[in-house]
Amino acid sequence: MAESDWDTVTVLRKKGPTAAQAKSKQAILAAQRRGEDVETSKKWAAGQNKQHSITKNTAKLDRETEELHHDRVTLEVGKVIQRGRQSKGLTQKDLATKINEKPQVIADYESGRAIPNNQVLGKIERAIGLKLRGKDIGKPIEKGPKAK
């Protein structure tokens, strides 16, 4: 018990800097002066809540010299979506709600502005009951027996 005097204070734990303090310009400069590794990265699309990002290979797009654009949904597919939606008596908003997408997504697909996404196309196909992919575009989907 000789090492514990009444006058000395032993600090057992010391809190580190909070997240806000660690991000400050002052903290970054201090860490650089100490020679520590500092990693800075910018958040990408943080507040935009993007559900379906473009998954096409951008490096492949960069290597192409002739056409520097992604393929869009054809107008034929857009017209089929529009006809199928109207035959079911749905508005763009109703169809979007039914497939858990935003109304703007449906508008983009119908106008031919959207980059095709198989997941979204599959949901629209099931909702309107018409094929949108492959060679039989516009034909009704045959419903087979359910697998058990």
Curated annotation (Swiss-Prot):
Changing S87D: Loss of binding to CALM. Residues 34-67 are annotated as: Disordered. Expressed in cardiomyocytes, cortical and hippocampal neurons. It is found in: Cytoplasm; Nucleus. The modification Phosphoserine is found at S4. Interacts with TBP and the transcription factor IID (TFIID) complex, NR5A2, NR1H3 and PPARG. Interaction with TBP is regulated by phosphorylation. Binds NR5A1, ATF1 and FOS via their conserved basic region. Interacts with JUN. Binding to calmodulin is regulated by calcium and phosphorylation of the IQ motif. This is Endothelial differentiation-related factor 1. It comes from Rattus norvegicus. The gene is Edf1.
